[in-house]
């Protein structure tokens, strides 16, 4: 096989991949890899294979090809290749829950120059996800902030979408469900502009899975089940084992909570789904997935022991201890904390005072290490649905406490680090609304000529003869995509509206009660019940600006942006906007090897 034919096989693999013939595409790339002599072509093909195996949930295979990329980059002594190889290594280790190595390789990628200005943004994103896996929430927010700065500078909407999903996952963990739903809604708004069928399905599947988790925690079980079912179907179509197993776990969680009010058989189905999901996670060596499933199984066993034949406190204790063991191996402190809290309750039921005290001390220590408490009221957050606020220094507080504190201070500083109290534009829900066009316009960023950091960009230029019927979304399918995205956004809007009405009812119920604080003087009910900005008020702030008279928020750090728009558009909640009939069927930003 000549070099020209080998390169044609490589390009044919790209066509097959976008047609969702994943196995055939991988086979083509492997064939061409055995024949190619050019180092750059081999590096690009290795990137394709790493990307494809990551999308399939085969993370050990992805790691193998990333290591081959690193060896090739070292042999060539090419800094741009090293930057990309380090990034793929960081992604592989993050997926394998080896977060320490993910952080090391992510930082190594940032230390090398890249041919594509977007590559550092994906390195920051991977670092943020690694910090999130280790429950280092402050460092996680800092890395998300850095990634969003790159996304704004390069107009990379797919990077912005993944940051939205990451922030949605973060605030779901911290139990600020309103913010989590807002970020996931923005991700859905961005994904509408992605009309490459397989890429659209890939990200929509990811968003719907996280959406099902947030909706379940909010109590919208019907909407959560609908989102989870759709995500599971897309995961099967895409061949993504990792997302499919997580969907099974999420669906089991939903059935578990439905079973509390419906039937014993529902919980039995839930337990069977946990076992199926756990087997898939073990087979894929997905440690983070194992921890998620074990944590859900332990919670189910701890709360619903009477529904299982022969199950007692001892079995629930064993599941929690097994979950702690694996979570400690990967450094996931947040899951360990939840297990210790459950163990304390179980030991209390068994009247084992010593073990109960040990579990509570461990939970208290982890709470301090993760700083899961508000400096103003002294109370933990992350236990119930509460509105939180992050400052530019990435410290997090109860939004109500922070707002009251800053109103009473002339020197507006963070109480933890004493830095100036500046709301983070990228994670604040109080930012100005960007234009709808800015959110829905596709990225126009391309890699510089000759760049190898994002190989699929150059591949797209070479494959300009791809037929729309074969690889791009047809008009009928495009309309279906838009209708599906609009349906998803409507689902989130309904949930946010219900959440807002619940918050309003709670605020009215305590309108005559003062809110004391150990560090801040007590405020009156009119100040304590200050309206908290939710998704609904964010998306309609221009229609209610005269109705709500709020005190001014803390100052923001001035920053530049195009067309005088805010530096981030993730806080914008645009209405659905169909694409023009004569417009392009594909976004100009082609999926790259960094779009994992």
From Swiss-Prot:
Knockout or disruption consequences: Mutants are resistant to levamisole, an agonist of nAChRs.
Listed SMART domains: PHD, RING, TPR
Domain of life: Eukaryota
Tissue-specificity statement: Expressed in muscles and neurons.
Keywords: Metal-binding, Repeat, TPR repeat, Ubl conjugation, Zinc, Zinc-finger
Pfam hit, one: Rapsyn_N
Record's compositionally biased regions (Low complexity): 535-549
Function of the molecule: Postsynaptic protein required for clustering of nicotinic acetylcholine receptors (nAChRs) at the neuromuscular junction.
Name used for this protein in its record: 43 kDa receptor-associated protein of the synapse homolog
Upper classification of the organism: Eukaryota, Metazoa, Ecdysozoa, Nematoda, Chromadorea
Gene of this entry: rpy-1
């Amino acid at each position: 096989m000549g070099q020209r034919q080998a390169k044609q096989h490589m390009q044919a693999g790209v066509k097959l991949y976008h047609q969702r013939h994943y196995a055939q595409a991988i086979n083509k790339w492997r064939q061409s890899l055995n024949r190619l002599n050019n180092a750059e072509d081999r590096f690009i093909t290795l990137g394709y294979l790493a990307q494809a195996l990551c999308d399939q949930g085969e993370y050990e295979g992805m790691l193998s090809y990333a290591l081959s990329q690193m060896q090739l980059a070292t042999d060539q002594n090419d800094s741009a290749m090293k930057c990309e190889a380090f990034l793929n290594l960081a992604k592989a280790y993050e997926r394998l829950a080896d977060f320490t190595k993910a952080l090391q390789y992510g930082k190594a990628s940032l230390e090398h120059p890249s041919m594509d200005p977007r590559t550092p943004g994906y390195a920051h994103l991977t670092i943020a996800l690694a910090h999130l896996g280790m429950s280092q929430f402050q460092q996680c927010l800092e890395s998300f902030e850095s990634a969003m700065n790159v996304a704004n500078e390069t107009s990379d909407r797919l990077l912005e979408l993944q940051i939205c999903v990451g922030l949605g996952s973060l605030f779901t963990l911290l139990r600020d469900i309103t913010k989590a739903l807002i970020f996931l809604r923005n991700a859905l708004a961005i994904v509408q502009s992605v009309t490459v069928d397989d890429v659209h399905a890939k990200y929509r599947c990811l968003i719907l899975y996280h959406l099902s988790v947030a909706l379940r925690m909010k109590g919208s079980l019907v909407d959560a089940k609908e989102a989870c079912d759709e995500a599971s179907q897309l995961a099967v179509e895409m061949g993504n084992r990792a997302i499919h197993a997580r969907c099974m776990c999420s669906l089991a969680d939903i059935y578990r909570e439905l079973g509390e009010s419906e039937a014993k058989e529902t919980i039995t189905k839930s337990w069977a789904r946990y076992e199926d999901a756990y087997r898939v996670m073990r087979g894929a060596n997905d440690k983070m997935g194992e921890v998620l499933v074990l944590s859900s199984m332990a919670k189910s066993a701890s709360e619903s022991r009477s529904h299982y034949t022969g199950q007692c406190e001892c079995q629930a204790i064993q599941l929690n201890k097994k979950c702690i063991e694996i979570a400690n191996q990967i450094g996931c402190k947040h899951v360990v904390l939840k297990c210790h809290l459950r163990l304390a309750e179980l030991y209390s039921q068994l009247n084992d005072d010593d073990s109960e005290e040990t579990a509570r001390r461990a939970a208290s220590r982890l709470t301090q290490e993760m700083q899961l408490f508000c400096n103003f009221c002294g109370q933990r957050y992350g236990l119930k649905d509460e509105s939180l606020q992050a400052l530019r220094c990435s410290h997090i507080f109860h939004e109500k406490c922070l707002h009251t504190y800053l109103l009473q201070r002339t020197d507006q500083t963070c109480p933890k680090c004493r830095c100036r109290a500046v709301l983070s534009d990228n994670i604040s829900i109080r930012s100005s609304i960007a234009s709808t066009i800015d959110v829905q316009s596709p990225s126009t960023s391309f890699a510089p000529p000759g760049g190898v950091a994002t190989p699929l960009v150059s591949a797209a230029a070479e494959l300009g003869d791809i037929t729309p019927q074969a690889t791009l979304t047809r008009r009928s399918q495009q309309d279906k995509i838009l209708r599906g995205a609009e349906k998803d956004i409507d689902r989130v809007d309904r949930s946010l509206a219900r959440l807002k009405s619940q918050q309003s009812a709670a605020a009215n119920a305590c309108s005559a009660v003062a809110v004391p604080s150990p560090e801040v003087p007590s405020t009156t009910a009119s100040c304590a019940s200050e309206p908290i900005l939710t998704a609904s008020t964010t998306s309609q702030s221009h229609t209610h600006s005269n109705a709500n008279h709020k005190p001014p928020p803390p100052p923001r750090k001035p920053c530049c942006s195009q067309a005088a728009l805010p530096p981030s558009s993730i806080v914008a909640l645009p209405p659905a906007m169909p694409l023009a009939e004569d417009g392009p069927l594909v976004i100009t930003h082609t999926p790259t090897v960094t779009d994992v």
